[in-house]
Amino acid sequence: MLNKKLADFSLPSTGNKTFRLRDHAGSKLVIYFYPKDSTPGCTTQGQSFRDAHDAFRDAGCEIVGISRDSIKSHESFKAKQGFAFELLSDAGETVCNQFGVMKMKNMYGRQVRGIERSTFVVDAKGVLRGEWRGVKVPGHVDEVLSFVRTI
């Protein structure tokens, strides 16, 4: 997938919209996948992107977050955290599967299928230029922002 043009996709988005990848041609885009709204790690991850949102915008880059949660859950999470970017609902896991982020994980001693925390950077031509899988939140957003500034 890396260094290849992404296939277009569309998902329901907060703000009563539909996100279509093709509508963002001409802008760089960070797509971050996270397991679940309002959980500690996902909240910290979203807050980190929120706090760096202006810097990403100054670098010509938009941000979207994707999980399997409902739009209703996303709207609440977005409002509570003050996110200036949209959250996309992939309840059917179509885009999660396109990016290969669905993994078996250990939760409290048992195997469950869920989203592996991952971030992808798409350039203004729709080409996947960067990917981080199994993300640890501390320092991650700064690393992604530094990369975005190089493309």
Label each residue range with its predicted role.
Residues 1-151:
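Chalcogenol-based redox active-site neighborhoods
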